[in-house]
Amino acid sequence: NVYWLTYEPSPDPGLRMPRRDAPPDPVLAVSPFYSTTVRLEEDEYYRSQLPWTEASDHWLWDRTIYPSSRPTLTFAVELSSLSTLVPYEALFSASIVGYFTYGDHCVQFSLNGSPSSLDSYIWSDDSRKDEQLVHIPFDSSILRDGMNELRIDGCLSDTTLDFIYYDWFELDIRRNYEADNDTLAFKVAEEGWQYQLDGFATKAVEI
C-alpha cells in the first residue's frame, strides 16, 4: 500500500490516496532478476598529486609496486543471491593511477583464481599521472555466491619498476529478488513486469 502524506496550512483537509489491493497479475511476466553495481572502495592513502588534476578524488585505497616489495594485492568480495538463470556478460571496472615507472604501466586483474577471467591493462602516461578508468567484460559463470577473490598483479612490460595506486573497483552483476538483512533495493527500468520478492523475515513489508 502507498500513502501520500501532506501538510497544508488551511482549513481544508489534505489530499488523500485511496487504499488499493494489488494481487499478482496472471498476465504480466515475473521479472527474473535485477541488475546492480557492487562497489568496493576504502580511503587509506591521501596523495595530493594523484591523479594529476585538482578536482579528482585524491584518496586512494592500495598500491602495487612491481616487481619488488608489493607485486600483488587480493580483495575479498562477498556476493549474495546471484542470478544463474542464464549466462550473461558481467562487467568489472576499476579506477587506477600510475605513480612511477620507467616505461609502460601494466596490471593483471583476475577473479577466483582464474588468470584468464579478466585481463591485463597496459598504458603509458609519461609524467601526467592521469586517472585510468578500466572496463573489462567477463563471463558471469566465474562469480560465486558467497566469497569471491579479486586478485591484482603487476605484470611484465618494458620497465624495471612499476608503482600503481588503486581507488575503487566495481562489479556490474545480476541478482535474484532476495532480501539481505530484511532489506532489498532495486531499480525498476520499465513497465509491464511484476516482482516476486523473497527472503524477508515476515510477511509485513514496507515499500
Task: Identify what each model region corresponds to.
Residues 1-206:
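Structured catalytic cores of large enzymes
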